[in-house]
Amino acid sequence: LMINSIDGHIVSSTIEHDAVLKALGDNVTLVAPSKKGNIAPRDIQAAIRPDTQLVTIAIANHELGTIQPLRDIAEVVRTERRRRFEAGELTPIYLHTDASQGAGQIDINVARLGVDALTLNAGKIYGPKQVGLLWCNRMIRLQPLVRGGGQERGLRSGTENVAGTIGFAVALELVQQHRNSENKRLRQLRDQLQNQLTEAFPWAIVSGDQKRRLASHLHISFPGIDAERLVFMLERKGVLVATGSACAANSGTRSHVLEAIGLAPEAADGSLRLTLGRLSDSETCMAAAREIIAAINTEKARLA
């Protein structure tokens, strides 16, 4: 909806989810991240042109878990908006964030974030599948996605999914209510899992910003080990891991996120994305660590 409602330049990053990247079109500037997956506000500022109408940056990266400085990016956009107003320039500029990955772990209050538009995915917070949300500042003139009966403010006509909407609202209320305690719990489990793996394999590489990342995410690489083989070996043991985003698990290509942060091909090909959730506990994390260590040792022996 946002992209189809503007006709100007877009600024985004090279590590956005494919759902965003593949919809951006050609009139776009993609900002490169740091090696930790951070998007610098100064780079966003440098990428903005007189015809830029939209900046879209995910609140947190879906693979690395790195949390972006969205409030600082929002200040960059507000400063540009003020400059245009004072100069008599009429081109609007808006900030959108895909907060799907961060809901339940990050404060997504739109006023505090300073965004003009925000999207969420119910499935990411244990809500109904295939239900999404777009919050949008009223000053943005959106073009309809589906025309017809005028439901959902005329933007997406058709009979509303009432049950899905209610389920989404309840799920969002629950995850926000337990956000702080769940973050603390997941962070302890994640760190426990990370410590077990890095103690067993000191040469392993943990990617992402260690100080600013989602409590649920651990991205770790084992250079020289075929991660695809690990995935299949671990699945047989009941341990579900991924080599990249779940949506791209069967693409057979190297992660564009890992390429963007400059991770060496050998390390990228040995990367696992481990995510924790409501059902994770200390016992299951310890068991998962044991199985991962055993699988890597099996692969090392095979390659010796």
Predicted feature residues:
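Pyridoxal 5′-phosphate
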Residues: 1-304
